[in-house]
Design a protein with these regions (language model features):
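Intrinsically disordered, low-complexity, charge-rich terminal extensions
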Residues: 1-361
Length: 361
């Protein structure tokens, strides 16, 4: 698998990205880190200045990531790899596959180089996967459309590795999972995902209720549930089939409603939601509002079982900054690093909750 080639952008590309895709506050920060101060200049003027500068590869990558964040909503998903063999090294398996030009993989996967980084004093490896997107009834000019995502893998304990996927499509996490499924020896390894089908109906509600309590560390204070998706429970559907004649003589205000998507405030205590719970339902997605304890930042995090199969993923869908004496919420953004840190913390806490619930079955 060939090494990714760095191509320096054209001047107009830098100017266009700075002017239209990067938030002003991040543009100021990036300039100041390079010793350039232009606080009173317009965004257009700053973009022209930046286009005339020469930057290293790391800074260019920061431009790219910030621009992508402004135009896409990144989601984080992941899985665990365990093995009955001794000395499992997912890193070594991946690198051997990457260096093997004769290895045949589906989807025309391109495996990027692994980069060693550190999180909370612990080493991990960052990689990149490019893959071909296949669509039914493909249109010719879309033939070469590709997906791309970054992933992070680290050893949690002997013979156990965790892989986290930072992508812009729900399919990204599943593609990374498919890749490692092809690379691993299926007779001695298992891949564990957060799949809603492994939870009973009431356990899906327990899962999201625990997320409300334990989703993020104390730096972020939970405020409200601002969106909620739920549907009729699997247990209820099976019971209705078995007792179809009896059900025909009984009707409730919820008869015929199979799924509901609510947006607003105080949704966890909503009367309609409680009635649905009484009749048996599954929670599949929730958007939670958090307020930062030390800064005027407010975020909306969407926690969702999505796709087929429905795998758990996390995304930040809204970012606000409270401004003025009235603390009016204005649209804002987080740095790429902080955005990823928040999603990672949330997903890992959700993974702990999920495993606790599944272990009780």
């Amino acid at each position: 698998m060939s090494q990714d080639k760095f191509v320096y952008p054209e001047r107009y590309e830098i100017q266009e990205v700075c002017e239209n895709f990067i938030k002003r506050r991040h543009l100021n920060q990036m300039m100041q880190e390079k010793g350039i101060f232009g606080i009173s200049a317009s965004t257009e003027e700053l973009s022209q200045i930046m286009s005339n500068c020469i930057f290293d590869a790391v800074t260019i990558d920061d431009f790219r990531k910030n621009a992508i964040q402004c135009s896409n909503r990144n989601n984080l998903s992941g899985f665990l790899i365990t093995s009955s063999a001794k000395d499992l090294s997912v890193k070594d398996i991946y690198e051997k596959a990457r260096d093997n030009s004769n290895l045949k993989l589906s989807r025309q996967y391109r495996l990027g180089m692994l980069v060693k980084e550190t999180r909370d004093g612990k080493d991990y490896f960052k990689g990149k996967l490019d893959y071909e997107i296949r669509r039914p009834g493909r249109i010719q000019f879309m033939d070469k459309e590709t997906g791309s995502c970054e992933f992070y893998m680290f050893e949690t304990k002997n013979n156990e590795w965790q892989v986290e996927v930072d992508g812009t499509r729900s399919s990204d996490g599943k593609e990374v999972q498919k890749l490692f499924t092809q690379l691993m020896d299926k007779s001695i390894t298992r891949i564990h995902v957060l799949d809603i089908d492994c939870l009973k109906d009431k356990q899906t509600i327990e899962f999201f209720d625990e997320i409300i309590k334990r989703g993020l560390p104390d730096e972020w204070k939970f405020q409200d549930v601002v969106a909620l998706t739920f549907r009729r429970g699997r247990d209820e559907v099976e019971e209705n089939i078995e007792n179809e004649d009896e059900e025909k003589s009984k009707t409730t205000p919820l008869t015929g409603i199979r799924q509901a998507i609510l947006e607003g405030g105080n949704l966890r205590d909503n009367e309609f939601v409680h009635k649905f719970e009484e009749n048996g339902c599954i929670f599949s997605a929730m958007t939670l509002e958090y307020q930062n304890a030390s800064t005027p930042e407010t975020i909306h995090i969407r926690a969702e079982f999505k796709g087929s199969p429905k795998i758990f993923e996390v995304s930040i869908v809204n970012i606000f900054e409270n401004e003025g004496l009235e603390a009016k919420k204005e649209q804002s953004s987080l740095s790429v690093k902080k955005n990823l840190e928040v999603r990672t913390a949330f997903w890992n806490n959700a993974r702990i909750i999920y495993n606790e619930i599944v272990s009780k079955q």
